[in-house]
Amino acid sequence: MNLTPREKDKLLIAMAAIVARRRLERGVKLNHPEAVALITDFVVEGARDGRPVAELMEAGAHVITRDQVMEGVAEMIHDIQVEATFPDGTKLVTVHEPIR
């Protein structure tokens, strides 16, 4: 299977998001990379489903809460920017203060 670097990045994020979901199910708090991967995956999949950019920007800030991440992680993440593929092309989605 020949994958482009972008496709490899997408797969890595998706796998990290799967790990993050499993940890949340077990009650384990997420670290920085897991939290970012989970929110990023939410945005990427929402874009593929055709959800509008503005909706993803707002909903992306409600994927996980401070109680679900390790101490200090929420303060480390001010913005998450994701290049996501929408039905009408690729767009940059920014989620401000994604962990509240």
From Swiss-Prot:
GO CC field: cytoplasm
Signal sequence, start to end: none
Documented EC number(s): 3.5.1.5
Catalytically driven reaction(s): urea + 2 H2O + H(+) = hydrogencarbonate + 2 NH4(+)
Pathway: Nitrogen metabolism; urea degradation; CO(2) and NH(3) from urea (urease route): step 1/1
Any one GO molecular-function label of the UniProt entry: nickel cation binding
Enzyme class: hydrolase
Keyword set, alphabetical order: Cytoplasm, Hydrolase
Subunit field text: Heterotrimer of UreA (gamma), UreB (beta) and UreC (alpha) subunits. Three heterotrimers associate to form the active enzyme.
Official protein name in the record: Urease subunit gamma
Annotated organism of origin: Chelativorans sp. (strain BNC1)
Gene (name only): ureA
